[in-house]
Design a protein with these regions (language model features):
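Soluble non-cytosolic domains of exported or imported proteins
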Residues: 76, 106-113, 146-150, 195-199, ...
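Periplasmic/cell-envelope proteins involved in peptidoglycan metabolism and beta-lactam response
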Residues: 1-310, 339, 416-424, 556, ...
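Beta-lactam-recognizing serine transpeptidase/beta-lactamase-like catalytic domain environment
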Residues: 5-12, 90, 96, 223-235, ...
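Ligand-recognition elements built from short beta-strands and adjacent flexible loops
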Residues: 456, 518, 558, 562, ...
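Conserved helix-loop functional segments at active or binding sites
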Residues: 262-266, 324, 541-544, 633, ...
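Acidic/histidine-enriched alpha-helical segments
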Residues: 129-139, 175, 269-282, 367-371, ...
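Extracytoplasmic
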Residues: 69, 74-77, 84, 92-95, ...
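Flexible glycine-/small-residue-rich
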Residues: 93, 100-102, 172, 189-192, ...
Length: 783
């Protein structure tokens, strides 16, 4: 028994020992495992925290900010653009951005279809496009339309209020507005929908005109809604863009555009036109025009003619190509981007260099037999007057615009000296590569300026071939920009100084401090004061001589005007008919003894269908004359009339209403007008035209004595190619009147244009302005 008991104890002890040892080991292992797991967990957490707080700090911070705040941009106002007198040419107008918040539409159970339908109708935006936006329920900002006018925004606001919509939003914005529409369009340029400059000065100086965007930052909840009990808002002011002041004078610009557009219509100009007005003493651009024009407020719209061609095309791709081509054409600034052969206007430059070199003087004489042989040419150079001008002085050679005389003058100057002056006048830059063609630009502060194209030095200097020198002497076989020509001619008449042209006078910040300031810059003196004075005297005779002056159609009574005509044949010709195409031009300056303004007009491809002879003298010269007639009085230049001019010039109708018939007749006769009386009364009760109207000298004023003027209308006749006197009398028979803007030199001049189209219905007493040109067939030529 004892042995059995003893044996049991022996069996139990090992049993207890064997159970206790595994428990301890398991506990230890568990503790170790927990420690390891803890270490691993903390390691992972530490790594994660390191990643979040250190490695990806910026990313998670941005995510947190995006969830906790809402940021609203405040659009900065773009700087205004002013003309030289402070008239606003470009400004900002208040508009709105209409957007939706799909997240709020979903949150507030608003009707997406209703919203899409109403906004589509009000804003003229595709319904499906808006409906698709509403499905982006994770988004808070989807723009439906930008630059919405206030009256349209009010309709959206009324819809939003009526339906109590939270998800439809209206945000204030600004858009660029041009008060004068198309005025100076090619200079000012325009901005896109994003308010970034896309063309003209708006593009070139975009960084100056653009302000700094402001911001409002507010606290929001996890749904992006403003938190009700958290007063947190940061406001960062926007900074307005800098203002720009131009040298452009809006009034001068208007006169340039008005008369250039009239010339395009009168002469059926096919390929646009350009005009530039410059202050010759400073180089400041007073006006710059390129036609066809466009409205800066609707710059993508093309002309009706171009739109018809686009609408007629059925292929969408070709329609798009036509639209792009039409837009690029109308946006192109012919005044500085197009090059052309200047023709006879360049004779001014040849004259100036020859006088400066002393190879000619006012006493020099030249003989023109109608042509002149030139070394290197098979055919002789012909003058526009095939019979020749015979013997002539230097002044007469310029008055006649004689090619033969200018070839002789060019040969006296010589090829190398000619190119030396061409460089000095800014037309080319001489290089060490004598075989390369030459070019140059004025460096004006406008984008898009093209460079000239001239023959290489080796070609031009060839001692066995004078053909290039001969042609260049009268402005052919090279191309320049209109801007280069007016800059060089200004140097010829301002005392000899080549000025750098510019259009930006200054750019000022909000404190009125100039951040950009431009002033007259003398590039170099090209000719002497004496040479310049002689050039002015000779060119005044080109306009002022009523017999020999080829520029006499630029004449304006009471003013001394100098200038030169130009007619150049275009290289391209009509393939089918072989018809020649021309660019006609005129450059004039006034007053001739002390020029305050130089004006260049260029008409690209006038039509022969008008019956007016195609030449600078018949088309461009009278256009410049009309511009001068308006601009010189505006500049404060006082006219001085000769007795002959007083006889021919337009008359201002006096007020004779209330006078006796006899007194009225006497008052009209005193100012060079006649009278026709209707009625049997003794007192004038009405008159046509009314007092203050300006009419042609010798016009018949209608006086009513106890009889009422007729309310009937008259049909405007076609006066083209009628003599001044015939046109005046034909209009008088209808109770209508003409005025000439004091451009008449003799009653035999003919009408080349009228400001009111034939067939227009007019009231009795209406005054129509006409353009007069010489009727002397011996003066008709391509000069």
């Amino acid at each position: 028994m004892a042995n059995e008991t003893s044996g049991r104890r022996d069996n139990r002890v090992p049993f207890r020992a064997s159970t206790k040892t595994p428990n301890i080991m398991m506990l230890r292992r568990t503790r170790l495992l927990l420690i390891v797991c803890g270490i691993l967990a903390f390691a992972v957490l530490g790594i994660k925290l390191f990643s979040v707080m250190i490695i990806h700090h910026d990313e998670y911070e941005k995510m947190a900010i995006d969830q906790q705040v809402r940021e609203t941009e405040i659009t900065a106002s773009r700087g205004a653009i002013y003309d030289t007198n402070g008239k606003i040419l470009a400004m900002n107008a208040s508009v709105d951005t209409i957007f939706i918040s799909p997240a709020e539409i979903a949150k507030n159970n608003e009707d997406p279809q209703l919203i899409a339908r109403e906004l589509s109708e009000i804003l003229d935006v595709d319904y499906d496009k808006i409906l698709s936006m509403t499905k982006n329920t994770d988004r808070w900002y989807e723009v439906v339309k930008r630059k919405v006018e206030p009256d349209v925004s009010e309709k959206v606001r009324a819809f939003k209020k009526e339906k109590k919509l939270i998800g439809v939003k209206i945000e204030p914005d600004t858009k660029r507005y041009y008060p004068y529409g198309s005025l100076a369009a090619h200079v000012i340029g325009f901005v896109g929908q994003d308010n970034e400059g896309r063309y003209g000065l708006e593009q070139r100086y975009d960084s100056y005109l653009t302000g700094s965007t402001g911001r409002i930052i507010r606290a929001t909840d996890n749904r992006g809604t403003d938190m009700l009990f958290v007063n947190y808002e940061d406001y960062y002011d926007e900074t307005k863009g800098n203002d720009m002041n131009l040298t452009i004078d809006a009034t001068i610009q208007y006169y340039l555009e008005k008369h250039l557009q009239q010339a395009v219509e009168d002469y059926d100009v096919q390929n646009g036109a350009a005009a530039i007005a410059m202050d010759p003493s400073t180089g400041a651009i007073l006006g710059m025009v390129s036609l066809g024009n466009f409205d800066l407020n609707n710059y993508q719209k093309v002309s009706d003619k171009d739109q018809e061609a686009i609408d007629a095309e059925t292929d969408p791709d070709k329609r798009s190509e036509l639209l792009t081509a039409a837009q690029q054409k109308q946006w192109r600034n012919k005044a500085l981007s197009d090059t052309y052969e200047p023709g006879s206007t360049f004779k001014i430059i040849t004259l100036a260099m020859a006088l400066e070199e002393g190879v000619v003087s006012e006493s020099s004489s030249f003989y023109c037999g109608g042509s002149i042989p030139v070394l290197g040419r098979t055919d002789p150079v012909k003058c526009w007057k095939t019979a020749g001008h015979g013997g002539q002085t230097l002044t007469q050679a310029m008055q006649h615009s004689c090619n033969v005389a200018l070839v002789q003058i060019g040969q006296l100057v010589g090829a190398r000296t000619f190119y030396k002056y061409a460089e000095a006048f800014g037309f080319l830059n001489l290089t060490n590569n004598v075989d390369s063609s030459l070019t140059a630009k004025t460096g004006i502060d406008l984008s898009g300026e093209s460079g000239s194209i001239w023959w290489s030095q080796n070609t031009f200097y060839d001692p066995e071939n004078f053909s290039q020198l001969a042609a260049a002497s009268f402005g052919q076989t090279f191309t320049i920009t209109p801007l280069q020509l007016i800059t060089a001619v200004s140097a010829c008449v301002n005392g000899g100084y080549l000025m750098k042209p510019y259009v930006v006078k200054s750019i000022v910040n909000g404190d009125g401090e100039a951040v950009v300031s431009n002033s007259p810059t003398v590039v170099r003196q090209v000719v002497s004061e004496q040479t310049s004075a002689t050039v002015r005297q000779i060119l005044e005779q080109v306009v002022g001589d009523p017999v020999d002056g080829t520029g006499k159609n630029a004449y304006v009574a009471g003013y001394r005007i100098g200038g030169k005509t130009g007619t150049s044949e275009k290289v391209a010709q009509d393939a089918a008919g072989g018809a020649k195409e021309y660019i006609v031009s005129f450059i004039g300056f006034a007053p001739a003894d002390d020029p305050q303004i130089v004006i260049l007009v260029l008409l690209d491809t006038p039509s022969s269908s008008t019956g007016i002879y195609i030449s600078g003298g018949q088309m461009a010269a009278p256009t410049v004359g009309k511009m001068m007639a308006d601009i010189l009085p505006y500049l404060g230049v006082e006219p001085s009339y000769s007795e002959t001019e007083k006889t021919y010039m337009d008359k201002t109708v006096p007020n004779v209403t209330g006078l006796s018939v006899e007194q009225a007749k006497a008052a009209l006769e005193e100012v060079g007008l006649q009278a026709r009386v209707y009625g049997e009364g003794n007192t004038v009760t009405a008159q046509l035209p009314g007092s203050g109207a300006v009419v042609a000298s010798g016009s018949t004023i209608l006086l009513y004595a106890g009889k009422e003027p007729s309310a009937d209308k008259e049909t405007m006749p076609d006066l083209t190619n009628l003599s001044y006197q015939t046109a005046r009398d034909r209009m008088a028979a209808l109770g209508l009147y003409i005025k000439t803007n004091s451009s008449i030199t003799d009653t035999a001049q003919i009408v080349s244009g009228q400001t009111v189209a034939a067939g227009t219905q007019l009231d009795h007493g209406t005054v129509v302005e006409v353009t007069l040109v010489t009727s002397d067939s011996s003066m008709l030529g391509r000069y």
